[in-house]
UniProtKB/Swiss-Prot annotation:
This is Ferritin, middle subunit. PANTHER family: FERRITIN. One of its GO terms (molecular function) is ferrous iron binding. Fe cation 2 binds at E59, E104, Q138. It catalyses: 4 Fe(2+) + O2 + 4 H(+) = 4 Fe(3+) + 2 H2O.
Amino acid sequence: MESQIRQNYHHDCERAINRMINMEMFASYTYTSMAFYFSRDDVALPGFAHFFKENSEEEREHADKLLSFQNKRGGRILLQDIKKPERDEWGNGLEAMQCALQLEKNVNQALLDLHKIASDKVDPHLCDFLETHYLNEQVEAIKKLGDHITNLTKMDAVKNKMAEYLFDKHTLGGQS
């Protein structure tokens, strides 16, 4: 049954929103995996764990906003299976940050693709929603991860575990 409130909301936009919800949930799931990897007793980097847990919560909030938007526009929510993260072990902090950067770039590209669909279908509400709540935030997240990667690389944190520990404690605020 078609929604009585639906207006100028193309079915391609509706389908793309459902795919984006899944991608945000996948990102949240991946960050949850990272967070609990870094809080293991044999890894014990609480700053990394906290950083990735916060990212997980943020991605979940993004999915929730999309779910609400879908309902406000009269679309239908069609949830899909959430894919398991590519890995179970995340290695060192630098490696995990590099994986997180790629994940954020993938999410950003999906948002840009969604914006293009909205623009092509002349949906100013969806364009405004994405511009207001997502696009700039993605660029900021990518920049922050890039900065962390640069600093971990400069510190040679892969070979120097003390540098990784200090980054965890002082940059990410880890409490030992």
